[in-house]
């Protein structure tokens, strides 16, 4: 009997030890598809976490909106049903209106400028509100490309935008960019854009350069204007419910891994953009560099309206950072 009890105790002890030492598996959902830069960086994050934790932290990836769109996944983070996802800093404007300022056309000059906003008192205030109200902890933000404009006619200046039927997503900042630049904003589903460009149902569209290449818009549009109108980022957000369950050691590993992979991701996107301009030129695309100052001037009514709605002069402060 004593022997059986000893064996039972030994088994229970081993089971407890195995439970304590079991790997932590986190779930990360995203809208990006397999093969995209975002997915590849998430895969790199999974590999980096496993390496840095010696196999104790694993990251399971759910790409291609398997878990819903970005709003659905953020809601899952709030409830603690999902651990990690991507979201743009300016996207927080849906819940925290002042955050939208960073995505207004021509407010962010480049990613370094956007990062200064993210790390400023303004950005910290937004992140604090994300945490306190929605259970979202922003670990870092990564560069995800700058939006440029393709068209079926050369765009050498803002004057060339007049009457241009420009496909944009159904988002305020993109609609405002088109309208205030003199174009005719034409919202439509992303999946319909290629055919619409091919048949001249629309005259142009706007997206980051990697998207223009991936979707092969350059096959049906022979003009690319470097309008630099909106800088895209993607925050890596973890559910605070998940964060509080982690040990201090695991938190440190995750934070360092996110920053390490973020640096690589940002550099990859910047390198891609530089190489893609040359690629498009080699494909016979006419690349133009219109003066951006008239575009910024055209956005002034939007900035004034935004500040008025928020009740404070946010835009000018962010633009000056």
From Swiss-Prot:
Pfam (any one): DctP
BP-aspect Gene Ontology terms: transmembrane transport
List the PANTHER family.
Answer: PTHR33376, SIALIC ACID-BINDING PERIPLASMIC PROTEIN SIAP
Q: What is this protein's function per UniProt?
A: Part of the tripartite ATP-independent periplasmic (TRAP) transport system SiaPQM that catalyzes unidirectional Na(+)-dependent sialic acid uptake. Binds the common sialic acid N-acetylneuraminic acid (Neu5Ac) with a high affinity.
Task: Provide the leader sequence positions.
Answer: 1-22
Superkingdom in the source lineage: Bacteria
Species of origin: Vibrio cholerae serotype O1 (strain ATCC 39315 / El Tor Inaba N16961)
Gene Ontology cellular-component terms for this entry are: outer membrane-bounded periplasmic space
Q: Which family does it belong to?
A: Belongs to the bacterial solute-binding protein 7 family.
Q: How does it assemble?
A: The complex comprises the extracytoplasmic solute receptor protein SiaP, and the two transmembrane proteins SiaQ and SiaM.
Any idea where this protein resides?
Periplasm
UniProt keywords, alphabetically: Periplasm, Signal, Sugar transport, Transport
Query: What is the protein's name according to its record?
Result: Sialic acid-binding periplasmic protein SiaP
Please verify whether the record's keywords include Transport: yes
């Amino acid at each position: 009997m004593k022997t059986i009890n000893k064996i039972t105790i030994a088994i229970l002890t081993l089971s407890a030890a195995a439970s304590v030492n079991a790997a932590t598996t986190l779930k990360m959902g995203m809208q990006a598809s397999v093969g995209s830069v975002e997915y590849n960086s998430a895969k790199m994050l999974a590999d980096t976490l496993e390496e840095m934790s010696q196999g104790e932290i694993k990251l399971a990836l759910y790409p291609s909106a398997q878990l819903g769109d970005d709003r659905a996944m953020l809601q899952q983070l709030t409830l603690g049903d999902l651990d990690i996802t991507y979201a743009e800093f300016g996207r927080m404007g849906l819940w925290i209106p002042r955050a939208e300022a960073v995505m207004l056309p021509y407010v962010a000059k480049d990613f370094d400028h956007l990062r200064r906003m993210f790390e400023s008192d303004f950005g910290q205030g937004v992140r604090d509100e994300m945490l306190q109200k929605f259970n979202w902890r922003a670990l870092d933000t990564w560069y995800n490309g700058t939006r440029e404009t393709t068209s079926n006619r050369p765009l050498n200046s803002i004057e060339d935008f007049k009457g241009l039927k420009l496909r944009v997503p159904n988002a305020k900042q993109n609609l405002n960019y088109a309208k205030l630049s003199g174009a005719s904003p034409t919202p439509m589903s992303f999946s319909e854009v290629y055919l619409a460009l091919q048949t001249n149902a629309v005259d142009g569209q706007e997206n980051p350069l990697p998207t223009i290449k991936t979707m092969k818009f350059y096959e049906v549009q022979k003009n690319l204007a470097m309008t630099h109108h909106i800088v895209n980022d993607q925050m890596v957000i973890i559910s605070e419910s998940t964060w509080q369950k982690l040990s201090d050691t695991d938190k440190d590993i995750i934070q360092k891994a996110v920053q390490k992979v973020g640096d690589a991701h940002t550099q990859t996107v910047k390198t891609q953009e530089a190489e893609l301009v040359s690629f498009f030129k080699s494909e016979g695309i006419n690349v133009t560099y219109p003066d951006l100052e008239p575009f910024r001037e055209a956005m002034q009514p939007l900035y004034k309206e935004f500040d008025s709605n928020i009740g404070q002069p946010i835009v000018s402060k962010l633009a000056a950072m």
